């Protein structure tokens, strides 16, 4: 790659403040930073002086204009120099890597004009290690140096081998050398070019928008085009050919556009509707099938639901009947339970009252005994009180009557003796010596008990004795009792029957005693029988439900184990089914996601596949994979390159042939068209014109004889020719001039000798020339015409081959573009698997998954039902488990029957006892009378006597003891005996005894009172007890009467049986009601489901009927549509698979949009308009196909068979593209040819204008994003003047109207142009300009254009670039952008003039960059980097850019010496160059 040339350094020698300073120029931006007067402008002035050493232009205003007087003629350069020789040198390395030192020597010229003498020179080939200062400055000593003169500089570089020094006498030569080596962008031929270049540099230096440049942008940006002046020949023929070609292009373009538009819009219109109907039909079919499936399924479900409903209703009716009976039984059982409970409560009350009655009887007896004891105690206390009273009275009497007392004491002594005698008697009778008066009382009670027993025994014996004595009477009584029990009986059998009755009574009593045990057993057996019956019912129900007969516990256990295992298995299976269902659902979701994904990529793949198929058809190669596509694309590219190369070679050959034909057709057949003008200038003729009439045979000889001089100019006199030659500006490098007679030229001046096939010409004694005969002689008109004939024939062949090669190249290029477009858009998906096939597979897989899910759900439902059945079975078995053992027990009924018999016996026994218990009891008492033996009477009498004697003895003992008890208080009179012996103490003793007796009396009275009170209390309690007893007794009798009225045998098991019966019936009733509720819920839910299902069925049936009608009706229409499409071979155009994935709304929108476009497209075609109007009927889709067929037919008729070899409009578009490309290329080639031959002024002007517009547009692209402050972009606005545009239109398109101007011999072409301009623009005043001058201006295309600069500033948008509308920084940035456009334009303009391996340097200036903000400076840096430009800016010392190279300049004054101290900061530019010894010495000297 060719690199752009770069300025490497600027060297200043002997300038103010700079004795010998070299500034390295950065590859991008070099910044000179310093305060005012630091030397920034001086440095830039030195650079500009070395670049444009023209003192007439140099004017450094910033140092001269401010405050300068009119008399001062200093242009700013004189004052910047020191006396003596000064240098400014630019070190440049160009694109060829050549080092060049362009320098100028400056020296002040004495005088008031302050002129400066400037001498430019260049040093080429200087070694890289040698610095410019090493050449321009000479070291005198270690501390001194001097500036060399230019001759000394030349001598100094002579020391280096290969270094060239060249001084220039003119600035033109200096700039020509600069242009040749790529230092400046434009070739500066004259002062005008230099002035433009300087104005550009000046505008760059001082910034802002230069009015001098903006006012004449056309001169700066638009290059001259002198070839327009050569457009006079063959104008009409060239215009006619171009017009024909343009007409063919327009026709082909119109046909192509029409074909494209109609094909695209009609295809979109019809295909969208076609695919919408196809999609709709497919969806309707799917909906119909779905509805039919749902309809049949709903019917089956409805039938099943109806069967279930009928079955449940039947069961419900049976259940209601049984429930009514159960309710009656339950009510009866509840009533019976109520009676039993009432009877039991009554019996409990009777028992409770009887208990209370017995308790009251006991308490009454106890109270009676207590009362008796109380009475006895009262009697004893009364007796004691009476005795005490009597004792007191006696003592008082005794005290009153001592004798009486003495008698009393004697009486008491006698009583005491009698009591002792009674004690002795009792001891004797009882034989107990330990008997005392105190113990006698207790013994009396004991003996009385014995007396009672003895009395009873005596009475019994006496009774028996009396019975025996009264046997006859008792026998009759006993016989009556027996007969009352057993009925009539013989007297002799009475005793036996009495025994039987008594035995039966005893047995009945024994049976009655077993009542509780038997009834408990009866309850247990009855419960067991009920459980057995329920168990057998459960077994029957289980057998009916599960078809398994439970015969024993083993079968029961096996069945329960089977169901338990089945439940476990089913639960595991259900878990597996749930997992499988989850997995299947996940697979279904994955399949749905995959379907969505495939449906999303299917249109892209279909488009890619269609593109691939089209590419295969175009290429004729089976493109199997990406590698094959890329490989064949490379092959196509190589083929296209080969065809393009062949086409280019043929085009080049055609151009060569045309150039050669043109040259040979020109007068003299000269290679250089300038020779004719030079001949006219020099007043001679061409040698070839003199020999124009030679024969073909002589042509080789004369061509070889004259050799290079065959195109010489023959003049009659050579005198004065040299002066004319010096004045020539443009002439061939070698120009031969021969003196001779033009009218009678003689070749004798040539010393020629003809050899074999050659000529030897002796020039002089020391030179000779040997020239062979040319194989193809071109000297002379005959030879040229012969050559022209051959060249024209060859040109025809080349043109034909070129056309064929162009067609093939265009076709191959389009194929490569197709490959390129396919690779860019479709290669990523084209070779992927077919998504439609994958869709079918995934949909089939999803269908399988759906079926598997349905099977799994059915299995799960079946398993759930089985699980529920097994759980119900286990529940039934669990209910049956406690009673399973009873099923096998066949003895229950026998035992129950046996107990029933016992219960019956019990009832009979209880009835017997209830009826005859009292009679039997009486009978038992006198039963013996029936079998009494009269012989037993004596024994009974003897026994009676013995018992009587024993009783009499006991009574004696009791009497003796009673006497002793009665006399026991006489033992207290033991002192009376002593008193009888002590009569003197009797009185005192009596008094003491009286006191004791009174005390005893008082106690006795108290005790009597207490005893009487207590007895009264006891009597009251006894009375209350008697009344309570009587009331309880009456209540018990009433309760017994009520109990008999209940009519219920309220035994212990009656309530339990009643409760069990009621609970059993309640449970059965509850179960029945639960089942009834379940049946009713089932019926209700089933009816609701059936109603909903019937409603849904009607709706589905209606929808199905409507859809089926629609589908059947649409089928016929669709078949007609398909038939039309297939018969007319448009189905493949209409059936676009990618549209199958669009919604109906999208397709309808697509069709409607195309319909609107088609209405406009066919508005001028009656047939298509009518067909389109008919096709808008949505009810007739076949009409859209008919419209599409009509469009195809219409396009087939429009196909030009002369250029298109197909009947298919789609394929015709491709061939039209090829034809259009061929015609366009032909026109382009002709325009190029016309431009080269200057045959069409208007075409060249238009083309030139278009080229410059495109070039300016490219310039705008580089600057559109530039930002300075509020300015966000800079652009050049170029437009054609309306008046000149009308002129161009008249030149190119209205030639027939203006034949009077261009075919008139009265006007030159320039005058005709001026006249035409006046004709087409009558409103424009031409002023004083002549038609010739105006015509020459009209031949310059730059006068046709208007240029202006616009900026995009803030909210104002694009506006005219004027300094007043912009800030200073914005104006500077905008100005730099404009200048950069100019530089780029100059480079493009001069590219053809310079060597191809040279890219010129690009550098601009900017002084006082302080007016730019940091962002704008950054934009400049970015601009330099992007456009490979160098920038030299001056900025105040407070600005230090982060990038590039920055030099800090500080001007210092030491005594009378002034210098600038420089510090360089390297950025990202080039590396520092090593300093030379001289430079180091100079820097040391300056410091």
From Swiss-Prot:
Kindly list the positions annotated as binding ATP. 34-41
Q: Which UniProt keywords apply?
A: ATP-binding, Cell cycle, Cell division, Chromosome partition, Coiled coil, Cytoplasm, DNA condensation, DNA-binding, Nucleotide-binding
CC per GO annotation: cytoplasm; nucleoid
- Report whether Lipid metabolism shows up as a keyword of the record: no
GO MF terms held by the record? ATP binding; DNA binding
According to its UniProt record, where is this protein located?
Cytoplasm, Nucleoid
Give one Pfam family.
Answer: SbcC_Walker_B
Origin: domain of life: Bacteria
The record's InterPro entries line, in alphabetical order, gives:
MukB, MukB/SMC, MukB_hinge, MukB_hinge_sf, MukB_N_dom, P-loop_NTPase
Any coiled-coil regions, as ranges: 297-458, 506-601, 637-666, 781-806, 836-1109, 1210-1266
- Region annotated Flexible hinge sits at 667-784
Q: Which GO terms describe its biological process?
A: cell division; chromosome condensation; chromosome segregation; DNA replication
Subunit structure, briefly? Homodimerization via its hinge domain. Binds to DNA via its C-terminal region. Interacts, and probably forms a ternary complex, with MukE and MukF via its C-terminal region. The complex formation is stimulated by calcium or magnesium. Interacts with tubulin-related protein FtsZ.
What does the sequence similarity comment in the record state about its family?
A: Belongs to the SMC family. MukB subfamily.
Q: What is known of its domains?
A: The hinge domain, which separates the large intramolecular coiled coil regions, allows the homodimerization, forming a V-shaped homodimer.
- What does the UniProt function comment say about this protein? Plays a central role in chromosome condensation, segregation and cell cycle progression. Functions as a homodimer, which is essential for chromosome partition. Involved in negative DNA supercoiling in vivo, and by this means organize and compact chromosomes. May achieve or facilitate chromosome segregation by condensation DNA from both sides of a centrally located replisome during cell division.
Protein name (record)? Chromosome partition protein MukB
Gene name, Swiss-Prot/TrEMBL: mukB
